[in-house]
């Protein structure tokens, strides 16, 4: 994830990280999507499907941590991931999919080309760093 947030601390593969990864993979609400090119993980994202009591009790999806390794950008891998995440959300009967991005104009246009609409809602964040 260094290509997403270069200031993030390095994660060491240890027992607690392996346990967390195992829990994440077993959680049916979380869908981890990856692109592998010749054994190299070049792009990934996560779709979380949340149960909901509105909209006829239909769930909604949140896409997070969309990242492509800098050496593999502009080759369609990110688009492939986003489209797959949207397809899964539809299969899960989500009434909407949301994502947030604080990146530059190119990134915002990337999401718009994938079908997302800018300016429909306003996002708010509280960080606990």
What are the roles of these predicted feature ranges?
Residues 69, 102:
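Residue-level recognition of the GNAT/N-acetyltransferase active site
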Residues 79, 91, 95, 103-121, ...:
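Conserved active-site alpha-helix within GNAT-family acetyltransferase domains
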């Amino acid at each position: 994830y260094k290509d997403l947030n270069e200031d993030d601390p390095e994660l060491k593969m240890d027992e607690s990280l392996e346990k967390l990864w195992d829990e994440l993979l077993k959680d049916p609400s979380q869908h981890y999507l990856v692109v592998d090119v010749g054994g190299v993980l070049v792009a990934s994202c996560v779709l979380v499907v949340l149960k909901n009591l509105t909209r006829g009790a239909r769930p909604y999806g949140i896409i997070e941590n969309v990242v492509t390794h800098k050496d593999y950008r502009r080759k369609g891998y990110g688009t492939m991931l986003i489209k797959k995440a949207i397809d899964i959300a539809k299969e899960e009967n989500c009434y909407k999919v949301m994502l947030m991005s604080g990146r530059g104009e190119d990134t915002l246009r990337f999401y718009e080309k994938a079908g997302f609409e800018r300016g429909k809602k306003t996002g708010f964040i509280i960080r606990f760093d």
